[in-house]
């Protein structure tokens, strides 16, 4: 058994954050609800709130063809690499075969977009495997609908599956939790027959994409009971959501005893989303991240859905603050996208007066049924000892080796200094702050981050 009990709430965590400024340049097309620009908006809020001081910020290496074909088929990845808007007429049959078209359009730079999303999750998993950090964040990832040989639901490559496969090299059991409003079908399907990965999805069920995720879908073969689905109805509130989330996840942590956790933080479960009918606020959504942060388990946090960009940026910024355990004010800091957050320019959003179709009795029965299945897990699955496979992203540098071999009379290379975090003592005001000279320096540094798109001080990994 792991010593995975809850820690003191304010325990310090080492947090890595993966971002590439190019991610915001990709465009699904006019009228499409998926806006990669929301990730750039998130990044600017993270920087201007000063959260970068508590993060190790990295620019991930793009995932290679070989990295992505650890899950996806060679034929599918060859298509994504070869097709583009200029030659799409040559790929009509393949577009139909691989479900690339209306919902999943073929846009300029699609393959490179997939490389960034997948590369971030692979790098995050590798960093956790090496025990260099406790939490790794990739808001560029979370594309949970993609299948082995098929695009689906605005997702082309499943960075989550790739990240979990990487985590499994070092961790016997990995827990995947999905709080997107849509069922995490691509991840569930990938691990439906294994007991080394438990997938848990809280989602809207019924006449709603992708139409999967019934309570009765519990896995097959060795994976029976290791797929957990919590189908919900419209209008669920923070209180109702947490009334079922916490008891179920507490039982999952007890019975499955994961060695690592991947949390998909899809923001389309928030009130006001263009596609989602839930009624969560940032506080209710963020409470899920806070729950897992309280455990002594390596945690990967990834993005996902979210189709009201200003609220996506709010949500993932808030959950970054939870990861580093820093309170941030409700007043939004000025940033390049400040006007997007009007008219109130506040971090937190309010719930609406929409009807909550999830009655207490319905949620109680749902909880009872899910926990009854979990109680049938009589033991924690074991794994045979075996050599650890080679890491993905073999280009990762060994930071400690670089530091050890550096000339003491010369400045450390930026690959090292970019990942360094300031000591907590740097953030006191007044006398403890050295007459506030450091605050002034930090303000200049934040401005430099903003003006340069956050690139200059990022560490490539």
Swiss-Prot record:
Impact upon substituting residue 145 to F: Loss of function
Enzyme class: hydrolase
Keyword Methyltransferase: no
Compartment(s): Nucleus; Cytoplasm; Chromosome
Outcome of gene disruption: RNAi-mediated knockdown results in embryonic lethality. RNAi-mediated knockdown results in delayed cell cycle progression. RNAi-mediated knockdown inhibits expression of hsp-6 when adults are exposed to conditions causing mitochondrial stress. Reduces the dve-1 protein level. RNAi-mediated knockdown results in defective piRNA-mediated silencing.
Entry EC no(s): 3.5.1.98
Effect ascribed to mutating residue 444 to R: Does not affect the piRNA-mediated silencing pathway but. Has fewer progeny at all temperatures with progeny number declining further in subsequent generation at 25 degrees C
Keywords from the UniProt entry: Chromatin regulator, Chromosome, Cytoplasm, Developmental protein, Hydrolase, Nucleus, Repressor, Transcription, Transcription regulation, Ubl conjugation
Subunit: Component of the SIN3S complex, which contains at least sin-3, hda-1, athp-1 and mrg-1. Probable component of a NuRD-like complex, composed of at least lin-53 and hda-1. Interacts with lin-53. Interacts with pop-1. Interacts with akir-1. Interacts with wdr-5.1. Interacts with cfp-1. Interacts with dve-1. Interacts with tra-4. May interact with nasp-1. Interacts with chromobox protein homolog hpl-1.
UniProt family annotation: Belongs to the histone deacetylase family. HD type 1 subfamily.
Function comment: Responsible for the deacetylation of lysine residues on the N-terminal part of the core histones (H2A, H2B, H3 and H4). Histone deacetylation gives a tag for epigenetic repression. Plays an important role in transcriptional regulation, cell cycle progression and developmental events. Histone deacetylases act via the formation of large multiprotein complexes. Involved in the endoderm determination possibly by repressing end-1 expression. Also involved in vulval development, possibly by repressing lag-2 expression.
Protein name according to UniProt: Histone deacetylase 1
Taxonomic lineage: Eukaryota, Metazoa, Ecdysozoa, Nematoda, Chromadorea
Gene name as annotated: hda-1
């Amino acid at each position: 058994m792991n010593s995975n009990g809850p820690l003191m709430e304010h325990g310090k965590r080492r947090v890595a954050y993966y971002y590439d400024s190019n991610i915001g340049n990709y465009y699904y097309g006019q009228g499409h609800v998926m806006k990669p620009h929301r990730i750039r908006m998130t990044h600017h809020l993270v920087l201007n709130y000063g959260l970068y001081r508590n993060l190790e910020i990295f620019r991930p290496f793009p995932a290679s063809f070989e990295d992505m074909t650890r899950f996806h088929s060679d034929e599918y990845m060859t298509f994504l690499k070869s097709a583009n808007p200029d030659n799409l007429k040559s790929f009509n049959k393949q577009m139909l075969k691989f479900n690339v078209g209306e919902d999943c359009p073929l846009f300029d730079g699609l393959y490179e977009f997939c490389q960034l999303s997948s590369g971030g999750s692979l790098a995050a998993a590798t960093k956790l495997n090496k025990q260099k950090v406790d939490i790794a964040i990739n808001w560029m990832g979370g594309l949970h609908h993609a299948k082995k040989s098929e695009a689906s639901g605005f997702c082309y490559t499943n960075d989550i599956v790739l990240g979990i496969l990487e985590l499994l090299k070092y961790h016997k059991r990995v827990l995947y939790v999905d709080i997107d409003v849509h069922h995490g079908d691509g991840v569930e399907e990938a691990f439906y027959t294994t007991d080394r990965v438990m997938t848990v999805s809280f989602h809207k069920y019924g006449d709603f994409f992708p139409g999967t995720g019934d309570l009765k879908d519990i896995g097959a073969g060795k994976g029976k009971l290791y797929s957990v689905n919590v189908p919900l109805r419209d209008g669920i509130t923070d209180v109702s959501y947490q009334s079922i989330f916490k008891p179920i996840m507490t039982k999952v942590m007890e019975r499955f005893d994961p060695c690592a956790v991947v949390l998909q933080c899809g923001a389309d479960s928030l009130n006001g989303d263009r596609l989602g009918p839930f009624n969560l606020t940032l506080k209710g959504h963020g409470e899920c991240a806070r729950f897992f942060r309280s455990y002594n388990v390596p945690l990967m946090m990834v993005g996902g859905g979210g189709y009201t960009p200003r609220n996506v940026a709010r949500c993932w910024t808030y959950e970054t603050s939870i990861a580093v355990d820093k309170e941030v004010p409700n007043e939004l800091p000025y940033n390049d996208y400040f006007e997007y957050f009007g008219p109130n320019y506040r971090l937190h959003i309010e719930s609406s007066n929409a009807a909550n179709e999830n009655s207490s009795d319905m949620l109680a029965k749902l909880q009872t049924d899910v926990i009854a299945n979990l109680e049938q897990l009589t033991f924690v699955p074991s794994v045979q000892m075996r050599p650890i496979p080679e890491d993905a992203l073999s280009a990762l540098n060994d930071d400690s080796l670089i530091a050890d071999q550096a000339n003491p009379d010369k400045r450390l290379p930026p690959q090292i200094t970019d990942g360094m975090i300031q000591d907590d003592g740097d953030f006191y005001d007044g006398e403890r702050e050295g007459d506030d000279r450091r605050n002034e320096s930090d303000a200049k540094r934040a401005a430099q981050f903003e003006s340069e798109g956050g690139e200059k001080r990022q560490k490539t990994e």
